[in-house]
Amino acid sequence: MTQFTEEEKTIRRIERRFNKGVVQYGLIEEGDKILIGLSGGKDSLALVELLGRRARIYKPRFSVVAVHVVMKNIPYQSDTEYLKAHCEAYGVPFVQYETAFDPATDTRKSPCFLCSWNRRKALFTVAKEHGCNKIALGHHMDDILETLLMNITYQGAFSTMPPRLMMKKFDMTIIRPMCLVHEADLVELAALRHYQKQVKNCPYESQSSRSDMKGILRQLEAMNPEARYSLWGSMTNVQEDLLPDKID
């Protein structure tokens, strides 16, 4: 019987869940050209590794390119030379794109929302410039479940970030290939790979409600170790006849 090291077990577990998500949600098709959003955090670094390796080994055949968006007026900084070297290690071309936004233009929305939206627009621009038909983002299962809880709590909506989303306005498909990967495994991978941390973190990070939802997800898993799978399953098990039905 083959004995695997702890590192090998972690990598095999991540790749198994990654490949399952890609296949289960039909995220990659023959001839795709996929732009990877590379922020510089552990999740996007892992995504470069996983997609770069899959592009060389598995069918259907597809190609990838990674972009790091620099928001010039936000003191959030990554070592771009490190990011470029990381991409080269997995055969992924690297692009850097600079942009900026003014948080004062819309005080009704948080700086995080405005920054995220402007980064997203930059991704669409670069994707079109490089002939890409899909954009891959590094959201994992925890991100998706936390967003589900946030939307229920703050928006009164049963919605989240889906593994695959067609953005008709931009004629572009957003994919999240790590949708079934657990954040704990990515933390372990980052330690095993010695991923370099960002030079400076975003000053608005602490204003996010996401850390609160991380705590709630941990509490749910303390009550029920299978809670994350129950939450995930609930998104495709909506029993409408057992929900309130308004009479117009």
Mark where each language-model region is.
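Alpha-helix boundary/capping and short turn/kink residues
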Residues: 27, 206, 221-225, 240
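ATP-dependent adenylation/nucleotidyltransferase module used to activate substrates
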Residues: 2-146, 154, 184-192, 242
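Residues that form generic nucleotide/phosphate-binding pockets
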Residues: 17, 21, 216-219, 234
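Catalytic subdomain that performs nucleotidyl-dependent activation
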Residues: 134, 142-222
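A short, charged, Gly/Pro-tolerant segment at domain boundaries
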Residues: 226-248
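Short, structured secondary-structure boundary patches
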Residues: 54, 110-122, 155-160, 212-229
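Conserved active-site and cofactor/substrate-binding residues in soluble primary-metabolism enzymes
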Residues: 13, 118, 181, 208, ...
